């Protein structure tokens, strides 16, 4: 049923029937307004969905266009050519169709959304404003009328006439507003019949245009579609015809694979595992290797089927000799060593089986090993801190600083391994070692030169900053105060051997110059620390703890670079006197078990400035808390008489010679509390060994002996032993760590502090 008409004549009467008819028109306008809002929302969602659909179809078309068919064989048939180009044809059709869709989408917003928004805001919005005005005037008129009717008839005539005039004016204004509102309501009701429907028609017309364009594209594509269908059918028929022949050949290969092997240009080829040296120990990398006997050329391609690709650059070397690896010299089976003409050192390879090793050995004319106990030692340490070593580093540094210091990623980007090895073989050759820098390095890439420098440092028998100082360097980097870190590292650097310190000085000066150009080469001090930390401070064992300390290795290198002038050009400051250190320590009644790693092992003190001095700051800081315990206080009280007359010179540390690490003062004396062994007492009654007895004889003269622990010790590393006072160790002999012995306790072999034990 339609809406009733609103008569202007009824505006004056303002009857209930008129109000009811007006309310039905208002409800219809509100319904229309909500519908248009929902329609606009759905229209925007539709346009967004069409855009997403178009984007997805374009991406699909791009994927089709990028793929290229590669058929088996050197040439392609006409059918294969037709099939190969079909994806590009599909992509062209889809793109053409999406171009038309985008035109439709771009017009949809102007054709559909904008007109509907305009009609809703301008027309229906105007009707709502008119309604607010009409309701306001209605309330005003009714209020004035009620007030007027409540006037007393006893008022003056003039007042009554004035009130009548005012009511007439309000009534007239209300009547005008009512007429305007009725006119606007009926106008909007009529306008919606065309202004609302016309945009929808325009949108559908655009949609039909898009579909018609698709129809035209389909007609144009029909010829290629027919051709492609025929090509696909022909290809399927050929496949069915050749499949039986391929299956027959496969069965023959399964039954007798050796008769159907391809003729190879190589004397021998197959997979081998090649031992590679890393920052932490060694690793075995799978390579596909080939060998030609005529040219003696070995090619190694790192490849692992599990990872599905190459793991690095190819490498080719010229064979010099091949030797079977002695079984007891390596944990792996089926190993043999290869020496190359153009690469220093020995390449250790592992075959897949004993038969496979025999075939490789035969192909390379391999020989059995010579059982010489000194052979392994002679092959190690090809890189040394000698004149050639310094020459190599200086040449590399000169080349980098003169023509590559601004190259981005300097020292971080690595060179090709084969090129690096070839450059090193040239630099390490005594014949070319004396040549000038430019003659050696001018033709090589900067990344090859920087990789050669790092590789040479890793080839040294031990790290440049030495195994025995690694723990001290790491502890220094862990100090909270920056000045303490610099001071401690300063002292440790001057305890390095002269050649190590000179090489480190040379390297740090160079890295400081590299860091000064970090805006060009992007290698900040922090980046250089990441690169050189594992090289200069590589650990002796690959452990989780060593990996966790890498970040502190980097900090050590950063401090060396930032403070290289102070560290290498000045002598470390003299540590505070021992009497001052004793007075500055707070006494504690708690005594915790001493730790092997935190306790001083040997302490050197000399007046000659050119000799090395142990860093006493870190030693006393780490051990004095356990010194001033209740047990130690008892010991100090028993010697209070002689201590009362001491001056500062009386508190000098006693000299402990390196070949007598477990020696202690013969009798308790004023100097003994600061001797290296005094903090290790586990009880006041612990016996003090005398320096004149046979127990003081050097352990070096008797390699395997028994020893007894003088003090308790708690290990902080897997390589150390924990023990209590009085424990007896077997097979005690010197270790590679200065200040430590190796011994066996309860079947476990580990490190023991030298000055914790006496030999039996």
Swiss-Prot record:
PROSITE patterns: PH_DOMAIN, RHOGAP, SH3
GO molecular function list: GTPase activator activity; phospholipid binding; protein-macromolecule adaptor activity
One Pfam family linked to the record: SH3_9
Tissues/organs with expression: Detected in embryonic brain and liver, and at low levels in embryonic eye, heart, lung, intestine and skeletal muscle.
Residue ranges constituting the BAR domain according to the UniProt record: 7-262
Residues the UniProt record annotates as site (Arginine finger): 412
Residue ranges annotated for the SH3 domain, each copy included: 702-760
GO terms classed as biological process: mitophagy; signal transduction
Subcellular location: Cell junction, Focal adhesion; Cytoplasm, Cytoskeleton; Endosome membrane
CC per GO annotation: cytoskeleton; cytosol; endosome membrane; focal adhesion; mitochondrion
InterPro entries (UniProt xref): AH/BAR_dom_sf, BAR_dom, GRAF_BAR, GRAF_fam, GRAF_SH3, PH-like_dom_sf, PH_domain, PH_GRAF
Keywords (A to Z) from UniProt: Cell junction, Cytoplasm, Cytoskeleton, Endosome, GTPase activation, Membrane, SH3 domain
Location (main, coarse): other
SMART domains on file: PH, RhoGAP, SH3
Keyword check for Membrane: yes
Disordered, as annotated region: 571-617, 658-701
Biased composition (Polar residues): 605-617
Domain PH as annotated: residue spans: 265-369
Domain Rho-GAP as annotated: residue spans: 383-568
Subunit structure: Binds to the C-terminus of PTK2/FAK1.
PANTHER family, alphabetized: OLIGOPHRENIN 1, RHO GTPASE-ACTIVATING PROTEIN 26
General function of this protein: GTPase-activating protein for RHOA and CDC42. May be involved in the regulation of neosynthesized protein export through a Rab-endososomal dependent export route.
Record protein name field: Rho GTPase-activating protein 26
Gene: ARHGAP26
